[in-house]
Design a protein with these regions (language model features):
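Alpha-helical transmembrane segments and their immediate juxtamembrane cytosolic regions
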Residues: 1-289
Length: 289
């Protein structure tokens, strides 16, 4: 995502990025606020409420659209941070990344020590607030792509190790809390995949390191095509997810260990096919990006 292209100003960047993501985003906000009435998933009162709040937040049945807001925020901030990223040395970026990594430990630290580093009910902007959040991922990715001098073998094995540690940590954080018969709130039990937690950073960085070992002059055609369709797939996949979950879990009553991969694969394929069909329609960029 960053830094901006040489010679591109802030307004050109905004126009290019937001013209791609905002129209489809708004269209799917309307669709998630209305279409579920057809199969009885929401009533008219909920639909009206969701439509009236489109400018404030995502609809009731479109929880996955939460990520659009951090993405929009990143796009807004990239022109501001780009001059620093373009000129920052490896050491300067490492300093930022270290503080970012410490900030990703704070959800766990809060469990043990309570409020820390200026946190209180009248101040959420703790000491590391400006080094926290998804901007850290952007700087980390730039550092790996530009400054990291590891060999291909070191990236492969190091990335694999980080992936394994991050994945095991995430899995363990759930299983050590999910006690049968004990009711826990969702934010408590889902701390392990709160995205800006250290284990998710390890898993993400490891994956990026492994991908960086792929040496090819250009991506295969099917990868490029899928990449172009990925935004539309993301926007619509919850429609398909509900359908396949109902089929595999309720109608066929498959065990969870079988149902989850079946739901995932079918949702992915359905979203891919539907997005591809829509892409053939003139003006489809306003719907799927």
């Amino acid at each position: 995502l960053g830094p901006m292209k040489e010679g591109q100003n802030m307004w050109q960047f905004y126009r290019h990025r937001f013209m791609r993501i905002l129209p489809p985003f708004l269209i799917f906000m309307v669709l998630y606020s209305t279409l579920p009435m057809l199969w009885g998933q929401i009533d008219s009162a909920t639909s009206v409420k969701d439509l009236s709040r489109i400018w404030l937040n995502f609809p009731t049945l479109a929880g996955h659209l939460w990520f659009m807001y951090p993405l929009i925020s990143l796009y807004l901030f990239i022109p501001i941070v780009s001059p620093w990223i373009s000129k920052a040395s490896a050491k300067e970026e490492r300093f930022f990344i270290v503080l970012f990594l410490v900030s990703t430990c704070m959800p766990y630290l809060n469990r043990v020590a309570g409020e820390v580093w200026g946190q209180c009910f009248w101040n959420e902007y703790h000491m590391l607030w400006y080094f926290s959040g998804y901007l850290g991922y952007l700087v980390l990715a730039h550092y790996i792509r530009v400054h990291l001098t590891w060999s291909r073998s070191k990236r492969l094995w190091g990335g694999g190790l980080l992936m394994v540690i991050g994945a095991l940590w995430t899995i363990y954080s759930f299983y050590c809390q999910a006690v049968p018969g004990e009711i826990l709130s969702t934010p408590v039990i889902e701390i392990g995949w709160a995205f800006c937690t250290i284990n998710c950073v390890l898993l993400t960085a490891g994956t990026f390191l492994i991908f960086s070992t792929i040496k090819a002059p250009s991506a295969p055609r099917w990868v490029t095509e899928m990449s172009k369709l990925s935004y539309g797939m993301y926007l619509m996949h919850i429609f398909w997810l509900g359908l396949w979950a109902a089929l595999f879990k309720h109608n066929l009553a498959l065990p969870t260990v079988m149902a989850i991969p079946c739901i995932a694969v079918c949702t992915f394929i359905s979203s891919l096919i539907a997005t591809k069909i829509i892409s053939l329609i003139p003006g489809s960029k306003w719907v799927i990006g």
